[in-house]
């Protein structure tokens, strides 16, 4: 079962090993308390060039290291070193298809006190066959969740802390059990925060609006890339401000962004059609630019990409 989803090799306790050997004890501290920091990274296969491109590799590892330090984890690697390790795993696994990369930093100590000091941090990296996380071709139906996004003064959403994703799991499960594809969470002030694992944008009168980082959201790497594409390629004004729940229903278009979600249109929220209930024109254009950029098909955005194979 493991083989059908995960790839052959992983980075574990300082070396690349067969993925079956990358195992932790059930007594591992972070397993009990969620005191781990993770990232999600995609690599895209370009068939014409026969090249695998890692998207925003350095940026993801820089964020992981920054977030890890916030949990008092001092990892003995630079972002550049982690990128090289990731390339080596991909090459050793002979990956020639789209793949998801999951790095996770955790405390490996076999102790049961919920604290962040006097423990030993470790980092693991593995590969995963992922495919589409949500339906980017037809759009999805979303539900505004009864669960509120974590407040920055409890567990900051700007950090990818494993334990904080119970909040996401509650919201996502509620949405799925109610017949929807995804959840949209409000923050403690009642404004729109984000999806269970995605940032959110609305389009109104030709302008893109998205919650600012102060609205208890993850400062998404894909979010930043999408803002760049909207401004430079589509010449769409982008405003960062609080979004009221009711603005979701009156938006012309809504879409979600994230490493996993990529650019996912939302065509219905709480049984209300968004616009005409189909993917909007700005979202369609944005998707075209984004999917071409991540596969290395737009030269000016190859700076976002790290090639894996030497040519």
Curated annotation (Swiss-Prot):
Its cofactor is pyridoxal 5'-phosphate. It holds the Pfam family Aminotran_4. It catalyses: L-leucine + 2-oxoglutarate = 4-methyl-2-oxopentanoate + L-glutamate; L-isoleucine + 2-oxoglutarate = (S)-3-methyl-2-oxopentanoate + L-glutamate; L-valine + 2-oxoglutarate = 3-methyl-2-oxobutanoate + L-glutamate. Disulfide bonds: none annotated. Its EC number is 2.6.1.42. Transmembrane segments: none annotated. The modification N6-(pyridoxal phosphate)lysine is found at residue 160. It comes from the Bacteria. GO terms for biological process: carboxylic acid metabolic process; isoleucine biosynthetic process; L-leucine biosynthetic process; L-valine biosynthetic process. CDD domains: BCAT_beta_family. The keyword Kinase does not apply. Keywords: Amino-acid biosynthesis, Aminotransferase, Branched-chain amino acid biosynthesis, Pyridoxal phosphate, Transferase. One of its GO terms (molecular function) is L-valine-2-oxoglutarate transaminase activity. Pathway: Amino-acid biosynthesis; L-isoleucine biosynthesis; L-isoleucine from 2-oxobutanoate: step 4/4; Amino-acid biosynthesis; L-leucine biosynthesis; L-leucine from 3-methyl-2-oxobutanoate: step 4/4; Amino-acid biosynthesis; L-valine biosynthesis; L-valine from pyruvate: step 4/4. Belongs to the class-IV pyridoxal-phosphate-dependent aminotransferase family. Acts on leucine, isoleucine and valine. This is Probable branched-chain-amino-acid aminotransferase. The gene is ilvE.
């Amino acid at each position: 079962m493991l083989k059908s989803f995960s790839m052959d090799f992983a980075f574990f306790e300082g070396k690349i090993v067969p993925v079956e050997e990358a195992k932790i004890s059930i007594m591992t501290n972070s397993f009990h308390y969620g005191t781990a920091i993770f990232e999600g990274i995609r690599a895209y296969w370009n068939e014409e060039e026969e090249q695998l491109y890692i998207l925003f590799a350095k940026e993801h590892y820089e964020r992981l290291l920054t977030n890890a330090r916030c949990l008092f984890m001092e990892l003995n690697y630079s972002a550049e070193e982690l990128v090289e390790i990731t390339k080596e795993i991909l090459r050793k696994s002979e990956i020639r298809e789209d793949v998801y990369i999951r790095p996770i930093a955790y405390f490996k100590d076999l102790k049961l006190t919920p604290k962040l000091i006097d423990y030993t941090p470790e980092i693991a990296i593995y590969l995963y066959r992922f495919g589409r996380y949500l339906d980017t071709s037809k759009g999805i139906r979303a539900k505004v969740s009864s669960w509120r996004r974590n407040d920055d003064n409890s567990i900051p959403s700007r950090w990818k802390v494993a334990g904080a994703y119970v909040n996401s799991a509650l919201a996502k499960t509620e949405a799925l059990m109610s017949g929807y594809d995804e959840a949209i969470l409000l923050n403690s002030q009642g404004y729109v925060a984000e999806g269970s694992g995605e940032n959110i944008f609305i389009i109104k009168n030709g302008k893109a609006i998205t919650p600012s980082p102060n609205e208890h959201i993850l400062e998404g790497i894909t979010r930043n890339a999408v803002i760049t594409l909207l401004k430079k390629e589509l010449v769409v004004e982008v405003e960062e401000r609080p979004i009221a729940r009711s603005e979701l229903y009156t938006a012309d278009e809504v879409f979600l962004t994230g490493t996993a979600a990529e650019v996912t249109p939302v065509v219905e929220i709480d049984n209300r059609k968004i616009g005409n209930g189909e993917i909007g024109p700005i979202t369609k254009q944005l998707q075209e630019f984004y999917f071409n950029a991540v596969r290395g098909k737009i030269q000016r955005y190859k700076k976002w990409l790290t090639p894996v194979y030497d040519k």
